[in-house]
Amino acid sequence: MSVSQNKLCKRLRRLVGKAIDDYQMIADGDRIMVCLSGGKDSYALLDILLALQKSAPIHFEIIAVNLNQKFPNFPERVLPDYLEKLGVKYDIIEHDTYQVVMEKIPAGKTMCSLCSRLRRGILYRYAEEHGITKIALGHHKIDVIETFFLNLFFTGRLKAMPAKLLSDNKKQIVIRPLVYCDEKDIVKYAKLKAFPIIPSNLCGVQKNMQRTIIKEMLLAWEKDYPQRIEHIFAALTKTVPSHLLDTELFNFAEIEQKAIRFCEESD
């Protein structure tokens, strides 16, 4: 391994470790379900967590779980062969969500939203049935920023992608340990580790055009204005509720009362 490759590995492990610490993602005795899709991000997540597990001061279990949605031409042996060679505990859930979605969504319409909801429900149910305490997903820094702009531009909300959250059913905790990691570093890491990548377009659906627009915008910014992406990400960790317009976040009615109290204390 070259010096630059060694630095890459150390950087990613350090950033994942920092995210875990900052957001208290993993506790002693946790059973972590790493959702493995066969893409570069989930492979990197599993690989880095396994490395950190060896030196962690606490004990936690890792289970790699893949949901085989029965997409056409899905290479069913790639993940089992890789995981068995790796020696990690794993499970493959087989559920034909592809057929369900094809029956419910008219031809030409995007099926990503329904597919995602079905996938999430199946994984949440598996987690509950198997005593999983944390569900680990492979979203990285750029995913967070893209989601922020998607919500800003298309739904009118200041909302990104949380590093840690309680699921809608209040039964699962979802964590994103790669939240501080750059996608370009993960691409390099995947090549270095020679992960057996499974194509993401097996369902035959085109990429989300809105997300593609955002991704192209961010790439242009990164080229023309270095550090802009870093500044945007940093801003997501340094919100000032009193300087926004959301009355749910800040009680503007208290400003007069605070001013009166200040004047009384100053007299």
Curated annotation (Swiss-Prot):
Main location: cytoplasm
Metabolic or biological pathway, per its Swiss-Prot or TrEMBL entry: tRNA modification
EC category: transferase
Localisation: Cytoplasm
Position of the signal peptide: none
One GO molecular-function entry: 4 iron, 4 sulfur cluster binding
Needed cofactors: Mg(2+); [4Fe-4S] cluster
One record GO biological process: tRNA thio-modification
Family statement: Belongs to the TtcA family.
Function per UniProt: Catalyzes the ATP-dependent 2-thiolation of cytidine in position 32 of tRNA, to form 2-thiocytidine (s(2)C32). The sulfur atoms are provided by the cysteine/cysteine desulfurase (IscS) system.
Note: The thiolation reaction likely consists of two steps: a first activation step by ATP to form an adenylated intermediate of the target base of tRNA, and a second nucleophilic substitution step of the sulfur (S) atom supplied by the hydrosulfide attached to the Fe-S cluster.
Protein name: tRNA-cytidine(32) 2-sulfurtransferase
Native organism: Dichelobacter nodosus (strain VCS1703A)
Protein encoded by which gene: ttcA
